[in-house]
Amino acid sequence: MSALLSADDLNDFISPGVACIKPPASTNTNTNTTTTDSYNENGEVEIQIDSQGNPLEISKIDGKQIQTNQLTPAQISLADCLACSGCITSAEEVLVAQHSHQELIKALQSPTKNKVFVVSISHQSRASLAMAYNVTIEIMDKLLINLFIKQMGFTYIIGTSLGRKLSLINEAKEVINRKTEEGPILSSICPGWVLYAEKTHPYIIPKLSTIKSPQQITGCLLKNLTCEALQIDKSEIYHLSIMPCFDKKLESARPEIYDNENEEDKSISISVPDVDCVITAKELITLLEECPQYQLIPPQPTQPTLGGDLDLSVTEIYKQYAPPNWPFIEYSWSNDSGSSSGGYAYNYLNIYRNDLVLRKGYDPNKFTINLINGRNSDIYEMRLIYDSKETLASAAVVNGFRNIQNLVRKLKPNTNKSMNNKINPLVARRRARMINRGKSESISQEIEIEIADASKVDYVEIMACPNGCINGGGQINPPTTTTISNTTGLPQKEIEKQWINKVLDKYNTIPILFDLSLPSTSSSLEIMKYIEWSENFEKHFNISNDRLFKISFNPRENKSTGTATTTDDNNDPAATALLVGSKW
């Protein structure tokens, strides 16, 4: 077992609330299936327990209970585990063996290591650490560089901004190219959500985006550029990635194409992963506690420094300890507009707007983005409006498995489409009442009363954790005492909520040096620079576009039932890591 896991806090990996994400099998015997489908299409479904302890499926519209179906009690076993990080036990054996702070320490202390160590750090992890130590992001960045470079012997350290920018740009390009497809394109950068879809909702797989996450893109870039800068082989490079989520360990182990000596012969493969080890901010703190020779906060007054570099500007330090051939170094640790998960939905709309301005001559001053709230703070919709009347594109953000389950229910193929297209009578009556009360039918007021529907947009940014990546399972937990100001007497959940908001505030202080959301020609030109650089990178290193940016997905069925999977993974350790939940 990991040192992070104890019987007392099995539910600390997704805060502030945990709910089992395994959907119960539908055993509804109600013969009026048409009515049920209609309710599911226009409302939301919740699972509740009645006073007798029986599970009930409650169909609601506008918060009003419409229909109740009794369910059989869900049977949960380890074979059902989705490795969602809500409890890490199912994947503990594999993940601790390959991706843990203990393995990192072993690699660092190995007398025959002969490895060049490099590290990339996510924006959310930097914010979590800065909040935990009550320092600014800039100071935390300097402390992290000091820790990894001067104390732990790493050669290079970078932020994940370049990988994220390329991921955002290519994600938007894919959605634009697939815009004519029926139903929304669903993001795939959250490995917990992806594994859930692969194991339980295979009909969702064709809707998933095929663009890699910033972690994997960064890994490919960093290993190749380090290899060239130091004239060494990729197998001699050890890449550590610090991420906000434990599921990122699973992502790094996906059975993808790594590095091929012969791009024409895919059977000749060298298993050199883009990311060798993934740890979280929480695990980094554990490492520091177990290894007192490493200190994130140097002791006073004889603190070790970056050879006096702590007095330099943080931008100069970023440049000094990145690979010399790393591009756009001034942006390498910068932030992006939109949500704390990377802003994929928001930036898709802005990149699409810039594309319309550049290619079709639209007036950039006539665009607006309207926000439509959902039934809770973890779901909302955005619409790109032109000239105050025409909706040209739409996107949604969906966080947390409760909202994800409602979304996948709506996206499930249904042969009775004619009924699904009907407006629910309750919705029709509500709209009639609004008109009778003299409500304006203007676009702006109509949007105010609408509820976000992620199933009807072009693109959905999906994250398994409530509040998104800023609340990832690997982020540092808040104190359990009243050490946070103005929290005396508050319940722990409220303290956790305040903590997350403060971490989000830290995240938002990371400067946005190149804003994809700016409706300007310069923004489009900057995007073109990134695209041109990545194309030159592919040619220079003889790497295909698919190798750098693309990922594929397959249904992952339960082996304990004897059902064969669609991939030959009997001898594939990466596939074993992904399917370990079905082997317990």
UniProtKB/Swiss-Prot annotation:
List GO BP terms, alphabetically.
iron-sulfur cluster assembly
**Which InterPro entries does the annotation name?**
Cytosolic_Fe-S_CAF, Fe_hydrogenase, Fe_hydrogenase_lsu_C
Record's Pfam families? Fe_hyd_lg_C
Which keywords accompany this UniProt record?
Answer: 4Fe-4S, Iron, Iron-sulfur, Metal-binding
Residue positions binding [4Fe-4S] cluster 1: C20, C81, C84, C87
Instruction: State where [4Fe-4S] cluster 2 binds.
Output: C190, C245, C465, C469
Q: Which GO terms describe its molecular function?
A: 4 iron, 4 sulfur cluster binding; iron-sulfur cluster binding; metal ion binding
Signal sequence region:
none
Instruction: Name the residues that span the membrane.
Output: none
Task: Note the SUPFAM superfamilies from the entry.
Answer: Fe-only hydrogenase
Q: Does the keyword Magnesium apply?
A: no
Describe the task this protein carries out: Component of the cytosolic Fe/S protein assembly machinery. Required for maturation of extramitochondrial Fe/S proteins. May play a role in the transfer of pre-assembled Fe/S clusters to target apoproteins.
Family stated for the protein in its record: Belongs to the NARF family.
Q: What is this protein called?
A: Cytosolic Fe-S cluster assembly factor NAR1
